[in-house]
Amino acid sequence: MSRQMWLDTSALLEAISEYVVRCNGDTFSGLTTGDFNALSNMFTQLSVSSAGYVSDPRVPLQTMSNMFVSFITSTDRCGYMLRKTWFNSDTKPTVSDDFITTYIRPRLQVPMSDTVRQLNNLSLQPSAKPKLYERQNAIMKGLDIPYSEPIEPCKLFRSVAGQTGNIPMMGILATPPAAQQQPFFVAERRRILFGIRSNAAIPAGAYQFVVPAWASVLSVTGAYVYFTNSFFGTTIAGVTATATAADAATTFTVPTDANNLPVQTDSRLSFSLGGGNINLELGVAKTGFCVAIEGEFTILANRSQAYYTLNSITQTPTSIDDFDVSDFLTTFLSQLRACGQYEIFSDAMDQLTNSLITNYMDPPAIPAGLAFTSPWFRFSERARTILALQNVDLNIRKLIVRHLWVITSLIAVFGRYYRPN
């Protein structure tokens, strides 16, 4: 294949990438007859000559798509596409491929890629407002101010290594304690409960409770604070909820408020749980105790990860916008699953991505600390992983993401017609 044909290929992929970005993912139906005019007009504006599937509607889209999938999954055939010199007009490749020679037509104008590759611009975001999907909203919608709406503390409870989950704690707390002074910190609807279970008397004095991470992003307004022995309607064993009027007062302080806040009164309290520990001064000896904070809980301003990242606080962080590529790939992914090629293609794309990154390194190698936790079709997450490589020059990171974006765009367009024989 000639150098000019590879440059034409690069320019056409730039055009396809632009086409994918500008389309609405909800209405795009593939390269049908209705799409030919829009794509042809854009090619004309970009000074790109017509390609086979645009100028000749008789070209079987299914055959073309099948050839492309074979092309992109064959490392020996698409190896040159992964080299950074793919965008270099001074390099003359010595490779050939049926897909390129059959469906990509050469043109005589100055390749668009020669201009674009010098801009060093990611140009990845298709619109000013990221697109939201309902399934990713969880408790709160990504664009809502997170501290404007009440939230149930039991929905925030996060289990970590060595810690029992919130609901499993119900059975544990109902079982008589086997030892003295077993602290706990749990949550239910409209209430946070903390205290110490014991099978013997606990003397009056100062006790400290570490606020777990899930509760440290909360503030409460109009709260009653009192002793209780109930958790989700189940009696907590090893605590005393009874009190008399003659008992010395029990108070507590939080890091954000130096005042002593009373327990077991009609006072309505408002305070923040962020900043560290709750210090409680027990006024009278008890055989274990449990303090309930019952009120309206909200997320602390600027403390929720959702405030900055628009990620749900109840699930693993996910990108809410994938530059619309995910919508285009839905049909292709369905076909891969239907024919049992999903894992095969995923492995090929992982190998392709690693090979691409390796080719940009000097000397060629996978950068230290690079590990993808998302599938190949979650482009924005992979782009974020690549852009986070601080030990790689920023311009190189940009070029890698742009290069991978072009390849993903090509898959998004041609993959819609993939029908394995």
UniProtKB/Swiss-Prot annotation:
Q: Which GO terms describe its molecular function?
A: host cell surface receptor binding; structural molecule activity
Q: Which InterPro entries match?
A: Capsid_hemagglutn (IPR008980), Phytoreo_P8 (IPR009807), Virus_capsid_a-hlx_vir (IPR008935)
For the keyword Electron transport, the answer is no
One of the record's GO cellular component terms: viral outer capsid
Q: Which GO terms describe its biological process?
A: fusion of virus membrane with host plasma membrane; symbiont entry into host cell
Q: Is Transcription regulation a UniProt keyword of this protein?
A: no
The UniProt keyword set, sorted, is:
Capsid protein, Host cytoplasm, Host-virus interaction, Outer capsid protein, Virion
Give the protein's function. Answer: Capsid protein which self-assembles to form the outer icosahedral capsid with a T=13 symmetry, about 70 nm in diameter and consisting of 780 molecules capsid proteins.
Provide the family line: Belongs to the phytoreovirus outer capsid protein P8 family.
Subunit structure, briefly?
A: Homotrimer. Homomultimer. Interacts with host peroxisomal glycolate oxidase (GOX). This interaction mediates its relocation to virus factories peripheral to host peroxisomes.
Tell me the protein's name: Outer capsid protein P8
**Species name:** Rice dwarf virus (isolate S)
Q: Identify the coding gene.
A: S8
